[in-house]
């Protein structure tokens, strides 16, 4: 029986989960090496492999609590420690952590930050200080995840789409990206921007505003904002995000991206 079938049957209760132990171990190993991904782009569309999430959830059930020593520091967890970061060409600055079952391509730099199980981080990406890449999040190549950013994770429900950040995006300081949000290639989020499934993203660069939910288009320059909403007790300003400009090859190569962002009043 294939590993996928063993894992799906064990999660559904049709097979004793002990029978799936070796299948779960092999699957988490493959996630760790980057041979399998919880989500991947196929013909331009992102596909979620639910059974890999089930494998992670089963690993929590099957794993035994084990003391982990790091000098004078002691931890207690069910997941073993990743032990081949130098061989994978990944730089992790103490006390940063990439959890076993997450994969970072060569050239990734992780400052004192955290990358959770099931996540995938593309080559050349920087995960800056105190940033978090949540479980199963998919981060592209040459992405900058600035200090204090929270990239949400999701394991349940298994069919839920994880947060996806495409290649060359810039996620500014203290941004929050959760609930399966999709950040398009080359997009820029200004500092403190929050992107979730329920917060509107409003493009104000055209004659008429265009609203998005949980999706930032490629090359969009986005800042945090508010918009008025009227309730029986009065008018309040609720959180939203505004697309105020667009990144282009011209800005990157000739004018300079930083200069363009300053013109727009965007802080990173």
Q: What spans do the regions from the language model cover?
A:
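Terminal amphipathic alpha-helical/low-complexity segments used for targeting or macromolecular assembly
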Residues: 1-90, 219, 224-268
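Structural signal for interior beta-strand "rungs" in well-ordered beta-sheet cores
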Residues: 90-230
């Amino acid at each position: 029986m294939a590993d996928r079938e063993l894992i799906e049957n064990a999660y559904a209760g049709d097979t004793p989960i002990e029978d799936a132990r070796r299948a779960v171990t092999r699957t988490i190993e493959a996630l760790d090496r980057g041979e399998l991904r919880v989500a991947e782009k196929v013909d331009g569309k992102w596909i979620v492999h639910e059974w890999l999430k089930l494998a992670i959830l089963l690993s929590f059930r099957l794993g035994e609590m084990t003391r982990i020593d790091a000098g004078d520091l002691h931890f207690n967890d069910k997941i073993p420690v990743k032990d081949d970061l130098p061989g994978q060409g990944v730089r992790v600055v103490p006390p940063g952590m990439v959890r076993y079952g997450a994969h970072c391509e060569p050239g990734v730099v992780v400052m004192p930050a955290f990358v959770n199980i099931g996540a995938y981080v593309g080559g050349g990406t920087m995960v800056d200080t105190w940033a978090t890449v949540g479980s199963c999040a998919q981060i592209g190549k040459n992405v900058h995840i600035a200090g204090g950013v929270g990239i949400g994770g999701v394991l349940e429900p298994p069919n839920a789409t994880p947060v996806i950040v495409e290649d060359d995006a810039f996620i500014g300081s203290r941004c929050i990206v959760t609930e399966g949000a999709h950040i398009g290639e080359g997009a820029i989020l200004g500092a403190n921007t929050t992107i979730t499934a329920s917060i509107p993203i409003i493009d104000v660069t055209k004659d008429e505003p265009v609203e998005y939910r949980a999706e930032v288009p490629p090359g969009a320059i986005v800042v945090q904002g508010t918009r008025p909403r009227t309730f029986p007790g009065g008018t309040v300003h609720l959180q939203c995000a505004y697309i105020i400009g667009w990144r282009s090859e011209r800005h990157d190569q000739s004018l300079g991206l930083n200069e363009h962002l300053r013109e727009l009043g965007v802080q990173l």
